[in-house]
A protein has these predicted regions:
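Sequence signature of WD/YWTD-type beta-propeller architectures
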Residues: 1-215
Length: 215
């Protein structure tokens, strides 16, 4: 069968304190509001929303006010993060091009599903301008995160793999040049994030799980 993700209609975004106590609900629109990350200054949130009828990126203030649509292309835009200076966004997108792929995407979305097997990485200004696709690798390229310098992006990809489950970490310049493989171990490495000084990485892996798929 095909690998599918659920897009839950009742997902909303909340603010909680450091102990997990919910302080405020930020979104109330019908449909999927999720995948939220906060800007470096702590004043803005970027998130994925279905409120326009498609899975697009939006921003809002930290208190939930002033929602602004950022992306407009048909397809699933998600997993966005701010650049260290808060001026750019990096995200992964699955954007169907052929009539067959477009029809399949719309059919799945109507059932609250997406098929995230073909995803590329994009960058844009925080207001959506200067949108640029920075990978054309094929397969699934996702979980992007800026290096603290703002000049490189680390991400997870299976573009190199014969089998789809072999995800490794790669780094690429923000303009799409100088692809470099970072990890080689195990079958799954994803969700990388840099330490503030850029010298260390934290990421998820299943390398020590006795050949199971627990991560």
């Amino acid at each position: 069968g095909k690998y599918l993700w659920n897009v839950y209609n009742d997902f909303d975004i909340f603010i909680a304190d450091a102990k997990g106590k919910i302080k405020k609900q930020l979104t109330y629109t019908k449909g999927y509001d999720a995948e939220a990350t906060v800007s470096p200054k702590g004043d803005k949130i970027v998130f994925t929303s279905m409120r326009s009828g498609d899975l697009e990126l939006w921003t809002m203030n930290i208190d939930g006010s002033n929602p602004q649509q950022i992306t407009y292309g048909l397809g699933y835009d998600g997993g966005a993060f701010f650049s260290p200076d808060g001026k750019q966004l990096v995200f992964r997108a699955s954007r169907p091009k052929t009539d067959v792929d477009i029809e399949e995407y719309k059919s799945y979305l109507a059932k609250g599903l997406v098929a995230p097997t073909n995803m590329e990485l994009y960058v844009c200004d925080v207001d959506g301008r200067n949108l640029k696709q920075i990978t054309t690798l094929g397969k699934a390229n996702w979980a992007p995160f800026f290096h603290p310098s703002g000049k490189k992006i680390i991400f997870s990809s299976n573009h190199h793999a014969e089998k789809g489950y072999d995800f490794q970490l790669f780094m690429i310049d923000v303009d799409g040049n100088n692809l470099q493989q970072i990890t080689t171990e195990s079958k799954f490495n994803a969700f990388p994030m840099f330490s503030p000084d850029g010298k260390k990485l934290v990421f998820s892996s299943n390398r020590n799980n006795n050949e199971t798929r627990d991560t």
